[in-house]
Each structure stands twice: as structure tokens, then as C-alpha cells.
């Protein structure tokens, strides 16, 4: 528990919930044999990889699930505050869902995994999907007009592919997206040390004196991560970003994720520091919104992830395999790298492999249309937050009050009853 524990209205339940909620998250679902499968895939020995998650093989999901159900039962029987009881019930059900997800991975049950992913993250929005495809087609037309050689050939192939997808369904959409040109030719590329300096400035700006910014010298991940438990933001030593990108990510990680954690812990509700059930859309949507205020090109990654997930799930009625999405990723790299997105990866095949593996995380890789679906959250959450801010429904101070979804009416009503909002 933290320094505010004495004033929490949920102190009776929070500590026990925290103990039981500690389990592998989706970001840790990395196939143990991914390097072997990568080698076989590149040699053409297999059409699609078969991922094995041995590190999850011995996780006691059944015992943890039973303990969570017992805690939920205790809260239902002993908690007098009906609204608090409901919020904890929803949060615990999310953790039970996590146990079910781990079980489906252990059993290599793609059908069950897909069912649970849909339960957690929902289905693809056809309106958003068609708008994203149109945005890609429009951007590719510019590439075709202004490029030549291999870049133009890849753009023409990808445009033809997406145009065919688009022709299979006709949906009106109120959404209109544009990929932002982000050429970094004139931008200075920062190393991990340079990125750390910018993060330190942002940390001081927000008065986050308890937090540390560190460079990870040994980790393999290329993603900047926030580790709330010991108040650290970790930057991989090989990370390279332009100055605008680094400033935007500092706003994303420190300005939103860390500040919401700190502000949530300072309220009377301990759960608000770790997140109400279903808070992710608000959390990532707000982070993307503020990131985009600093760096317009930040929206491109969300559009790309939504496009690829939509193709996997079959936005046009045809589900797709690992191999087909890998091919699309290669074409994106060849036709749009340097113009619509920047990456340190120099090889199209290594870029495509890394992106596709992330999309199919948790699945075996053998079943068309089965992927993590988590990538849907970023663009959908951004659109929800954008609407709330444009309508002035909540102030910036209220948006940052803790980890909840400002677009979730139940969250807002609950927090207003507690006078947190």
C-alpha cells in the first residue's frame, strides 16, 4: 500500500486484490520459440509459424481464478457501498478473464482465445475500418505519384490490395483520417541518452520527484516502458527517436500514464491508481491524444495497427493468416518508410516479422483471424477522448484524476458520487 492508504475507502479490499491481480499481462505473452520459427519462416520451410508459450505453461490459473472468485464473493457479502461493490466486481471479472486467457494459451485453444479477446476488446468497427483503409489508399496514391522504382512498385501493389478489400464492403463512415507525412531527414536522431534528457525535463515539469528515468542496458525490448511498482520509466539502450517523437512519448508516458497513476493514488479510492475495470480505452486514448498534440505523426501508428488488425479479423468478410499480414507489413515498409513512419529497422522482412508477431501475440499463429485485438484500443480510445475534449464534457484536471475511462458513463457517475470528479 502507499502513503495514502489510511484514507482509502476501499483499503479493506485493495491490498488483497493487488496480491491476486499480479499475473502475466498480454505484453508478456511472448512465444518462447519465436526465434526458431523466425528462422524457419525466412528459409521458407513453413508458411505460418507455430508459437509455443512455454513460460506460461505452469502458471496456476485455476487456483488464482478460484481465489479471485472468493474475493469477489466476500466483497459482495460484506461491502455496504453498492457502487464500490459493483466496481470491484467488474475489475475482478477482468482478472478472471485474464486467467481464462492464460488457460486458453496453455491449451493452444485458438477458438477460445479469440472468444476471450473479443469479450475483452470487442469487434472491429466497420466505420473506423473503412475510414482507415481510405486514408491508406489516399496516402499511397501520393507515393505512387511522387516516387519511382521499388518504392512505387510496392505502393502500387499495396494500393491495389487495399482497393480490392475496400470494394468488398460498402459502409458509410463519419470518420475521416489522414496519414501525416513525418519525414525525419532534417531531424536530429536522439540516442537513449538524449531521450532520457528530454524525459527528465518532462519529469521535472510535472513535479514527479519520486520517479526515475533509466536506460535499460540489458533488456531486449525496444519499447519504452513505465514500471509503476518501483516508479521507473525505462528506455532501451538501442532506442532511437527524433526530438518531436521523444517529446511526444514523454507526454504519453509521463504526462498521462504516470500522472494519472499519481493523481489516482492521491484520491480516496485506491483502485483509481491502478485502473477501474475497462479503463484502458480512456487511458490509451488520452495518452494518444496528448501525444498527438506534441507530434502530429503520432496518429500514424494507431492507424497502422487498426488497419492490420482489421485485415486479420476480416473487416471485408475474409479472415487472414500470419503469412498474408506479414506480406502486407512488408509492402507498408517498402512503400511508406521514411515518409509516413520512421523506424530503426533496416530490413523489410525483419520489420514485417516483428510487427506481425506482436499482432498475433497469444495465438498459435496457425489460425486465420485469431489475434490479440488489443491494438483496437488505441484508435478507438483516441476517438472517444477527442469527442469528450471537443465537447468540453470534462476538464483536463478531471481527465487526469486517475485511471478511469472518461467515455464510460458508469465510471464517471461512480466517481462523481464519490466527489472525486
Name every feature range the model reports, one short phrase each:
Residues 245-259:
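Short alpha-helix carrying the canonical HExxH Zn2+-binding catalytic motif
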Residues 58-64, 68, 244, 259-283:
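Post-HEXXH active-site segment of zinc metalloproteases
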Amino acid at each position: 500500500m502507499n502513503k495514502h492508504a489510511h484514507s482509502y475507502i476501499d483499503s479493506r479490499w485493495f491490498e488483497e486484490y493487488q496480491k491476486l491481480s499480479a499475473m502475466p499481462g498480454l505484453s508478456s505473452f511472448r512465444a518462447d520459440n519465436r526465434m526458431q520459427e523466425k528462422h524457419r519462416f525466412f528459409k521458407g520451410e513453413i508458411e505460418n509459424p507455430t508459437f509455443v508459450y512455454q513460460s506460461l505453461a505452469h502458471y496456476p490459473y485455476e487456483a488464482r481464478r478460484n481465489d479471485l472468485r472468493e474475493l469477489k464473493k466476500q466483497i459482495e457479502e460484506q461491502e455496504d457501498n453498492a457502487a464500490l461493490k459493483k466496481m470491484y466486481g467488474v475489475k475482478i471479472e477482468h482478472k478472471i478473464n485474464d486467467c481464462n486467457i492464460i488457460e486458453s494459451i496453455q491449451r493452444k485453444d485458438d477458438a477460445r482465445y479469440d472468444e476471450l479477446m473479443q469479450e475483452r476488446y470487442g469487434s472491429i468497427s466497420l466505420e473506423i475500418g473503412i475510414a482507415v483503409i481510405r486514408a491508406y489508399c489516399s496516402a499511397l496514391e501520393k507515393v505512387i505519384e511522387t516516387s519511382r522504382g521499388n518504392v512505387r512498385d510496392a505502393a502500387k501493389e499495396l494500393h491495389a490490395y487495399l482497393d480490392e478489400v475496400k470494394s468488398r464492403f460498402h459502409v458509410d463512415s463519419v470518420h475521416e483520417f489522414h496519414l501525416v507525412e513525418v519525414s525525419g531527414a532534417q531531424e536530429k536522431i536522439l540516442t537513449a541518452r538524449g531521450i532520457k534528457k528530454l524525459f527528465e525535463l518532462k519529469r521535472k515539469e510535472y513535479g514527479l520527484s519520486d520517479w526515475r528515468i533509466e536506460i535499460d542496458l540489458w533488456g531486449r525490448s525496444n519499447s519504452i516502458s513505465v514500471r509503476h511498482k518501483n516508479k521507473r520509466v525505462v528506455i532501451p539502450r538501442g532506442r532511437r527517436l527524433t526530438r518531436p517523437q521523444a517529446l511526444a512519448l514523454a507526454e504519453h508516458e509521463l504526462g498521462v500514464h504516470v500522472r494519472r497513476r499519481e493523481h489516482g493514488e492521491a484520491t480516496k479510492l485506491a483502485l483509481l491508481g491502478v485502473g477501474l475495470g475497462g479503463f484502458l480505452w480512456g487511458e490509451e486514448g488520452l495518452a494518444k491524444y496528448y501525444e498527438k498534440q506534441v507530434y502530429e505523426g503520432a496518429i500514424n501508428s494507431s492507424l497502422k495497427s487498426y488497419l492490420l488488425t482489421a485485415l486479420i479479423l476480416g473487416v471485408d468478410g475474409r479472415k487472414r493468416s500470419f503469412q498474408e499480414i506479414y506480406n502486407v507489413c512488408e509492402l507498408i515498409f517498402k512503400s511508406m518508410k521514411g515518409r509516413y513512419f520512421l523506424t530503426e529497422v533496416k530490413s523489410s522482412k525483419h520489420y514485417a516479422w516483428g510487427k506481425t508477431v506482436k499482432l498475433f501475440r497469444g495465438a498459435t499463429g496457425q489460425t486465420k483471424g485469431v489475434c490479440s485485438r488489443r491494438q483496437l484500443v488505441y484508435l478507438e480510445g483516441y476517438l472517444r477522448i477527442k469527442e469528450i475534449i471537443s465537447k468540453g464534457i470534462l476538464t483536463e484536471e478531471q481527465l487526469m484524476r486517475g485511471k478511469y475511462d472518461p467515455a464510460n458513463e458508469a465510471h464517471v457517475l461512480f466517481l462523481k458520487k464519490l466527489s472525486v470528479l
